[in-house]
Amino acid sequence: MSSEDLSAPGPSAPDSSFTGPSTKFELERETELRLEVEGTDPVRVELVSGLAEVFGTELTRNKKYTFPPGSRAAIFTWHGCTVQLWGSPDVAYVSRDTPMLLYLNTQVGLEQMRAQAEREGERGPRVLVAGPSDVGKSTLCRLLLNYAVRRGRRPTLVELDVGQGSVSVPGTVGALCVERPADVEEGFSAQAPLVYHFGSTTPGTNIKLYNKLTSRLAHVFNLRCDSNRRASVSGCLINTCGWVKGSGYQALIHAASAFEVDVVLVLDQERLYNDLLRDLPHFVRTLLLPKSGGASERSKECRRESRDQRVREYFYGPRGSLYPHAFEIKFSEVRVYKVGAPSIPDSCLPLGMSQEDNQLKLVPVTPGRDMAHHLLSVVPLDGGGAEEGIEERSVAGFIVITGVDTERQTLTVLSPAPRPLPKCVLLIMDIRFMDLK
């Protein structure tokens, strides 16, 4: 369950047996080829001539890149290029209407802030990206992180979108030091992410816990910046969820305060931009940016499949080259909890306890058949085995309950590491995963 267990496999050689119709696209300067792969067959792309990039990662000429079903990508060129495509994507067209120049100008501004921080011994920009669902927040974060790394920086990606899980699996928040551009096919290398258990794909299920974990991430990031000058100068990009009203909006304000952000980038929603402009401190630079025309709304089914794919990649690797372990553990060998007790009338609460306190309570879960297929976070215990503050401790890894035998009192689990489990507490998620591989 060490950080090595979370690492992604290395790139594999292209499959020369790939077949499908072939199309050549000639892209003029400052245009992009937009792709959506929704069917059952992958699509392959090759840069034949010129220069191009995917969300800030440069493409290597004459190398084939595979985009599996569910992929959405934009191949952008600053100077013009030729791209060969194999397969039948649901969407494939060239667009001149792209916000890339605005995004590049944003990166230039952030780099100027980093250079100034370097000269004056200050900290670099801390950037929060906000906006409703499906406007390209994660893509903008990836783009700006890639550009920063290509300039020699080492920014930190902070993932607060519990429904997506770009740092780890869905149902978590986390942070990742980005040291190299994202792989076109696999994303950022998650060698040693810092991950915390939330347990659900929507912050509203336990907003008290969500805000507490946000504060915890900010505290740990501050400690790292205090001890690592390069990390401090490089700053961070904070990706947020698409819930921007009511408690979701207050969670945005809380995140901005906890991380002491300097810059807020709002995608596509003028009302949110004006609200943040009004409610954030005057020194915070709040910018309204357009979303890309390639950003389209995803259905609930598409989101669910995307979450399943993230969990599958955790256990099997992006290319299916990892081999998780299946083994049994006895009921008596594990302690399983859920963070947050069910709401009860205030009159029934213990004296001095509030509903908010109830949201952070560890509730024991008795192993049973209803645990089947649930994802669980593995939280290591210290030498004394104390369970205080478990909800604020970082996660070592994840397991899935694939079977429950109540007669033999055993659980069958899927784990990235072999038995035995470390001395730990298991925190159950609302998220289920059917291991059909």
Swiss-Prot record:
List UniProt keywords, sorted A-Z: ATP-binding, Kinase, mRNA processing, Nucleotide-binding, Nucleus, Transferase, tRNA processing
Q: Does the keyword Metal-binding apply?
A: no
Question: According to its UniProt record, where is this protein located?
Answer: Nucleus
Primary residence = nucleus
Q: Which GO terms describe its molecular function?
A: ATP binding; ATP-dependent polydeoxyribonucleotide 5'-hydroxyl-kinase activity; ATP-dependent polyribonucleotide 5'-hydroxyl-kinase activity
Binding sites annotated in the UniProt record for ATP? E32, R72, D134, V135, G136, K137, S138, T139
Q: Quote the EC number.
A: 2.7.1.78
Name one cellular component (GO) term: tRNA-intron endonuclease complex
Q: Which reaction does it catalyse?
A: a 5'-end dephospho-2'-deoxyribonucleoside-DNA + ATP = a 5'-end 5'-phospho-2'-deoxyribonucleoside-DNA + ADP + H(+); a 5'-end dephospho-ribonucleoside-RNA + ATP = a 5'-end 5'-phospho-ribonucleoside-RNA + ADP + H(+)
Instruction: Name one process (GO BP) from the record.
Output: cerebellar cortex development
- In this entry, which stretches build a coiled coil? none
Q: Does the keyword Acetylation apply?
A: no
Q: Where is this region: Disordered?
A: 1-25
Give the multimer and partner information: Component of the tRNA splicing endonuclease complex. Component of pre-mRNA cleavage complex II (CF-II).
Q: What is the role of the protein in this entry? A: Polynucleotide kinase that can phosphorylate the 5'-hydroxyl groups of double-stranded RNA (dsRNA), single-stranded RNA (ssRNA), double stranded DNA (dsDNA) and double-stranded DNA:RNA hybrids. dsRNA is phosphorylated more efficiently than dsDNA, and the RNA component of a DNA:RNA hybrid is phosphorylated more efficiently than the DNA component. Plays a role in both tRNA splicing and mRNA 3'-end formation.
Which family is this sequence assigned to?
Belongs to the Clp1 family. Clp1 subfamily.
Task: List, alphabetically, the HAMAP family matched.
Answer: Clp1 (MF_03035)
Name listed for the protein in its UniProt record: Polyribonucleotide 5'-hydroxyl-kinase Clp1
Organism from which the protein derives: Xenopus tropicalis (Western clawed frog)
